[in-house]
Amino acid sequence: MWGGNKSIGRVSTAIYIALEAGHPNACFLGDVYHTYKGGSDFDALKMLGPQALQVFHWNDYPSNPPREKIGDGDRVYPGDGVAPISDIVKGFLQVGATPVLSLELFNKKYWAMPPLEAARIGIEKMKASVALAL
């Protein structure tokens, strides 16, 4: 899914493509930011199960800029924005999904940090954001 793309910017279109692929291992690569950017409701993820939800890009987004203007570089560490992170995790668990969470950030402020520090903070923020939902 790619939130800014008209062809594959919503959960529904990405799932449609995976279904139409007809491959037994086809799945959905979700992303917190792209779900928001594309205008999908996070509750749509509850319609998917473990087969479709194997990996999910984990990040957050601020309240400003608005959806129409937000860009990849505006992503922030999980828990530092306004995304419904706890609800997303609870939704995964409701459908029996335990996807691998992959931190994906394109924030130049983080890129300017020493790599190990950025990674350490990222792992801590990921763990904390999931723990709040459990």
For each predicted feature, which ranges?
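Active-site-proximal beta-alpha loop/turn segments in soluble metabolic enzymes
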Residues: 1-5
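Histidine-acidic metal/acid-base catalytic patches
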Residues: 8-30, 34-134
